[in-house]
Curated annotation (Swiss-Prot):
This is Protein E6. The keyword Transcription regulation applies. Coiled coil: none annotated. It comes from the Viruses. Belongs to the low risk human alphapapillomavirus family. The cancer-causing human papillomavirus E6 protein has a unique carboxy terminal PDZ domain containing substrate but low risk E6s do not possess this domain. It comes from Human papillomavirus 3.
Length: 152
């Protein structure tokens, strides 16, 4: 079911609030990708919700992002807006707070990192990256995807 809201309405920023405010069930919700305009599949909609990504509003209509465009945009943003990289201790020194209390997302899929993923960066001495003014790392899934060795 398509959704539209007036420009002065308080537009919900996440999928669950969008469903609640419009009375549309999650399974009936239809969003298009803000980048390529294709309709998100049910799986992409679920992933969008689980990654806690914000709904984007254009001309009174809500948009999400498909899996392919999220990956492409993540790579493009990293290449275009990378500022510098630090180990966990450097990030904590710069921000004056533990990474455990900071919102750090995966630079590939944009999922918020959980404590175990942040701990892995610390324990395995992997760098976090400052991209577009925000600290980014790798989630468990993207970490393994980026470290796969190609057999010779």
């Amino acid at each position: 079911m398509a959704v539209a809201m007036s420009m002065d309405a308080n537009c919900p920023k996440n999928i669950f609030l969008l469903c609640r405010n419009t009375g549309i069930g999650f399974d009936d919700l239809r969003l298009h990708c803000i980048f390529c305009t294709k309709q998100l599949t049910t799986t992409e909609l679920q992933a969008f919700a689980l990654r806690e990504l914000n709904v984007v509003w254009r001309r009174g209509a809500p948009y999400g992002a498909c899996a392919r465009c999220l990956l492409v945009e993540g790579i493009a943003r990293r290449l275009k807006y990378w500022e510098y990289s630090y180990y966990v201790s450097g990030v904590e020194e710069e921000t004056k707070q533990s990474i455990d209390t900071q919102q750090i997302r995966c630079y590939m899929c944009h999922k918020p990192l959980v404590k175990e993923e942040k701990d892995r960066h610390r324990n395995e001495k992997r760098r976090l990256h400052k991209i577009s003014g925000h600290w980014r790392g790798s989630c468990q899934y993207c970490w393994s995807r980026c470290t796969v060795r190609i057999p010779r």
